[in-house]
Amino acid sequence: MAKTNPSPPPAPERIAAFRTGLSAETRAAAYLMAKGYRILARRFRTPYGEIDIVAKKRGLVAFIEVKARAKLDDAAYAVTPRQQQRIVDAASAWLMTHPEHADLELRFDALLIAPRSLPRHLIAAFDAST
């Protein structure tokens, strides 16, 4: 039987970035719940991409990309057109697995997180035609 070499451990900066992302998503989810949203999914992964948070408020489902940066203004520019398309594709996959939400209004938001700042919720940050 052939031996396989274990993969090397992740670099410390990758671990730190992962933890920062998890912390930002937790802050974002708490902020959204305080604003009346119900969290339907977190870190929903598909072959097409990942959605950080899927949240519902009344007749609306929001697919929310969370961005954490040192400054809120830096976070605002962090969702690239390519990433937007991956989120739109992942949202389509989520809707296929949750058809009960397909008739609701759909929206693509961004939630920006920075240290010592309140989160900034960019409603309709981009649309599915991106």
UniProtKB/Swiss-Prot annotation:
Pfam families: UPF0102 (PF02021). InterPro entries: Restrct_endonuc-II-like, tRNA_endonuc-like_dom_sf, UPF0102_YraN-like. It comes from the Bacteria. SUPFAM superfamilies: Restriction endonuclease-like. One of its GO terms (molecular function) is nucleic acid binding. Gene3D superfamilies: 3.40.1350.10. Belongs to the UPF0102 family. HAMAP family: UPF0102 (MF_00048). This is UPF0102 protein RPE_0358.
